[in-house]
From Swiss-Prot:
Any Pfam family hit: Pkinase
Modified residues (Phosphotyrosine): Y189
Protein family according to the UniProt entry: Belongs to the protein kinase superfamily. CMGC Ser/Thr protein kinase family. MAP kinase subfamily.
Keyword Cell membrane among record annotations: no
Native source species: Arabidopsis thaliana (Mouse-ear cress)
Protein name: Mitogen-activated protein kinase 20
Sites of Phosphothreonine modification: T187, T192
Encoding gene, per UniProt annotation: MPK20
UniProt remark on domains: The TXY motif contains the threonine and tyrosine residues whose phosphorylation activates the MAP kinases.
Tree of life domain: Eukaryota
EC number per UniProt: 2.7.11.24
Length: 606
């Protein structure tokens, strides 16, 4: 017995030293708490990148909560887009068949749109335009995958000080399939009433379309313009009153499409109300933005534009090029087969385990080959990580900074771990050549009024201490121009295991080490193996127009060089304005990225 235990311990240690990865992250501080978990900021010691780690505890206590977690991590794996929050990693649990908690690693975002609206009373028209552009671009991508978010609100939109927005919280999202009924029972639809489309008011049994998300985006944009919610209804009746006060009484034909009988009767008996002109409701807004907002907030869902149609609106002229905005292949029914049958906790546990393996390519390969050792335990680093979270949770409310616990035995487990990236520990990822970035030579030839910039620099004042947002980031042909020193890369999702993607593609936001060439026979075998995993996915994605790679690192070796690059990008921007360019050229760093104090920490759970 003792020999068997010793052998088991040796196997566990060997297994964990190969695949365990909790020691990869150094926990910093608690940045958010909720009923189902806690979020801490951390440092990825492999890349030096700041991340947010969300601990979700007791995920199998209620099967509905477990299904929601599975749905979200699955959708965030499939929906890879720069305007959607990215899961970078999911840690291996101590036991694949007995775990209760999971640790999900996200890219770190500094705040959310709700806090941005509260803290900034000096947002410009460029901010408003850029915010709506990002939200519609993300929504176009989501809807082309046949996914409806269903819970869009400012707290579910993460934000950075460089004006970057990312949609998060897909726990209430649903995937629509063409051969299945579009009518569902909305028992779990508890989205905030203020952003809920009128056709859903008081309705729990309804057909849903992408128009419900479009309405939510309209409410969010109006809140950005006003600085407060547009329809803060206290109940369903009050909500309908607020809507009709602004939009006027809907036609009888429109009322007939409201599913709830009581709401339908109330609207029918309502006195005739004329609509209020949006120019009167939003006196300082761009007239073009108000014309688009009227379309987004059409009472009848048939009159609302799609996200793609909204991006083609004149409001985004010179900013968005609809044909270049990313789209997504529709999600297959097999991915969400669990939604259409009765599942047990063990079924959900197995499906979540399978999702976790997507972030551990070697284990995934073993699992697909039937050689995975599911009964092995790997306790050391995960247990230490759990203690770090508990320590920070217990002390987060006390005065003064809380120092995270350090490892007492740094040698266990060893640092030779396998990750979802080919970057060596302590090394830097190699760069890709990006053929879609701005040409510095053409940038230098753009007419630029330096006298105006100097005058603007003299008039620049320090940001207020409570201000969060800096000037709007630059663009390149309708896409966000990424900083030359930004280490992130993005690619639309595929279902291929990371270890089997082409060496020149980007996997989970990281670059592979180098390109390899394959002989025809080997390539045929590789394609056959691809088809086993994802027969409908194109193999060669080298020319994917949605890849956004880091570029220009060799040209930006110091702070001044970075400022020059950012200023050149601003010079090439049409419609962003001289003030933003002045901020970029101002002394003291790349001012267009951050102005004023950034509030570190957030109440929003990822």
């Amino acid at each position: 017995m003792q020999q068997d235990n010793r052998k088991k311990n040796n196997l566990e240690m060997e297994f964990f030293s190969d695949y365990g990865d909790a020691n990869r992250f150094k926990v910093q501080e608690v940045i958010g708490k909720g009923s189902y978990g806690v979020v801490c900021s951390a440092i990825d010691t492999l890349t030096g990148e700041k991340v947010a780690i969300k601990k979700i505890h007791d995920i199998f206590e209620h099967i509905s909560d477990a299904a929601r977690i599975l749905r979200e991590i699955k959708l965030l794996r499939l929906l890879r887009h720069p305007d959607i929050v990215e899961i970078k990693h999911i840690m291996l649990p101590p036991s694949r068949r007995e775990f209760k908690d999971i640790y999900v690693v996200f890219e770190l975002m500094e705040s959310d749109l709700h806090q941005v609206i509260k803290a900034n009373d000096d947002l410009t028209r460029e901010h408003y335009q850029f915010f709506l552009y990002q939200l519609l671009r993300a929504l176009k991508y989501i809807h082309t995958a046949n996914v409806y978010h269903r819970d869009l609100k400012p707290k579910n939109i993460l934000a950075n000080a460089n004006c970057k927005l990312k949609i998060c919280d897909f726990g209430l999202a649903r995937v629509a399939f063409n051969d299945t009924p579009t009518t569902i029972f909305w028992t779990d639809y508890v989205a905030t009433r203020w952003y809920r489309a009128p056709e859903l008011c008081g309705s729990f049994y309804s057909k849903y379309t992408p128009a419900i998300d479009i309405w939510s985006i309209g409410c969010i944009f109006a809140e950005v313009l006003m600085g407060k919610p547009l329809f803060p209804g206290k109940n369903v009746v009050h909500q309908l009153d607020l809507m009709t006060d602004l939009l006027g009484t809907p036609s009888l034909d429109t009322i007939s499409r409201v599913r709830n009988e009581k709401a339908r009767r109330y609207l029918t008996s309502m006195r005739k109300k004329p609509p209020i002109p949006f120019a009167q409701k939003f006196p300082n807004a761009d007239p073009l933005s108000l014309k688009l907002l009227e379309r987004l907030l059409a009472f009848d869902p048939k009159d609302r534009p799609t996200a793609e149609e909204a991006l083609a609106d004149p409001y985004f002229k010179g900013l968005a090029k609809v044909e270049r905005e990313p789209s997504c292949q529709p999600i297959t029914k097999m991915e969400f087969e669990f939604e259409r049958r009765k599942v047990t906790k063990e079924d959900i546990r197995e499906l979540i385990s399978r999702e976790i393996l997507e972030y551990h390519p070697q284990l995934l390969k073993d699992h697909m080959n039937g050689a995975d050792k599911a009964s092995f335990l790997y306790p050391s680093a995960v247990d230490q990580f759990r203690r770090q979270f508990a320590h920070l949770e217990e002390n987060s409310g006390k005065t003064g900074p809380v120092a995270p616990l350090e490892r007492k035995h740094a040698s266990l487990p060893r640092s030779t771990v396998i990750h979802s990236t080919a970057v060596a520990r302590g090394g830097q990822p190699k760069l890709m050549n990006n053929t879609n970035t701005l040409n510095p030579e053409t940038t230098q030839n753009i007419p630029f009024n330096h006298a105006t910039i100097q005058a603007q620099q003299r008039n620049l004042s320090a940001a207020k201490p409570s201000t969060f947002m800096g000037p709007v980031a630059p663009f390149d042909n309708g896409r966000i121009s990424r900083d030359a020193y930004d280490p992130r890369s993005f690619i639309r999702s595929t279902n291929l295991p990371f270890s089997q993607q082409s060496a020149a593609t980007v996997a989970m936001g990281k670059q592979q080490e180098r390109r390899t060439t394959m002989e025809p026979e080997k390539q045929a075998r590789q394609i056959s193996q691809y088809n086993r995993y994802a027969p409908d996915v194109a193999i060669n994605i080298d020319n994917n127009p949605f890849i956004m790679a880091r570029t220009g690192m060799n040209k930006a070796e110091n702070i001044s060089d970075r400022i020059i690059i950012d200023t050149n990008l601003l010079q090439a921007t049409a419609g962003i304005g001289v003030a933003a360019a002045a901020a970029a050229a101002a002394p003291g760093g790349s001012a267009h990225r951050k102005v004023g104090a950034v509030r570190y920490g957030m109440s929003k759970m990822y």
